[in-house]
């Protein structure tokens, strides 16, 4: 909040802090960029987070921190973009504000990018999208272990008590992460 009160000076401090970007620096700069509706600064932050994955948590947290009303145009554009990274962050932002990403979720589940599929499968359960239960069950056979885990977890949340339970049990016995 102090950075917001500081206005342009606060924004400049955040930009300077990105010389050595970490989670906190990325978070502060992203909050300022979102509040200022600065698309160039957001694009720079996306590039930083993609090249330094440890800083992504700050970017995602900023999307969850700011008022949902500040995100409406930005998230809508990201959900319909070609870039899987931006779509993944948009889905994460939606779920952090308890907003259903809409039709973009079904499209993301079928995407070739495993990180986007993983986030979409997770969001399916978080949003209670029972219409996507068949897609979650189909994703139990995904090549990616994280996709399989979130498909199973979401399918259980959506009411499946057979295939998804077995998949979660196998996941745990195999010693997989999550």
Where are these regions (language model features)?
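Short, solvent-exposed linear motifs at loop/edge-of-secondary-structure regions
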Residues: 15-39
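Short inter-helical turns and helix N-cap capping residues of alpha-solenoid HEAT/ARM repeat scaffolds
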Residues: 21-24, 51-55, 82-84, 112-115, ...
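Amphipathic alpha-helical scaffolding segments comprising HEAT/armadillo-like alpha-solenoid repeats
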Residues: 6-17, 38-49, 68-80, 98-110, ...
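Structural detector for internal amphipathic alpha-helices that build alpha-solenoid repeat scaffolds
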Residues: 1-5, 27-36, 55-68, 85-99, ...
């Amino acid at each position: 909040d102090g950075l917001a009160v500081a206005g342009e000076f606060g924004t400049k401090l955040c930009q300077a802090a990105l010389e050595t970007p970490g989670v906190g620096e990325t978070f502060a700069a992203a909050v300022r960029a979102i509040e200022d509706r600065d698309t160039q600064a957001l694009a720079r932050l996306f590039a930083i987070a993609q090249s330094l994955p440890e800083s992504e948590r700050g970017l995602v947290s900023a999307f969850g921190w700011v008022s949902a009303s500040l995100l409406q145009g930005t998230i809508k554009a990201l959900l319909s973009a070609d870039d899987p990274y931006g779509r993944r962050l948009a889905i994460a932002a939606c779920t952090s504000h308890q907003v259903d990403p809409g039709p973009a979720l079904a499209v993301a589940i079928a995407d070739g990018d495993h990180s986007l599929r993983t986030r979409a499968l997770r969001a399916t359960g978080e949003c209670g999208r029972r219409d996507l239960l068949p897609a979650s069950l189909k994703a139990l056979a995904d090549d990616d272990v994280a996709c399989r885990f979130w498909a199973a977890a979401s399918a259980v949340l959506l009411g499946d008590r057979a295939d998804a339970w077995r998949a979660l049990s196998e996941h745990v016995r195999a010693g997989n992460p999550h």
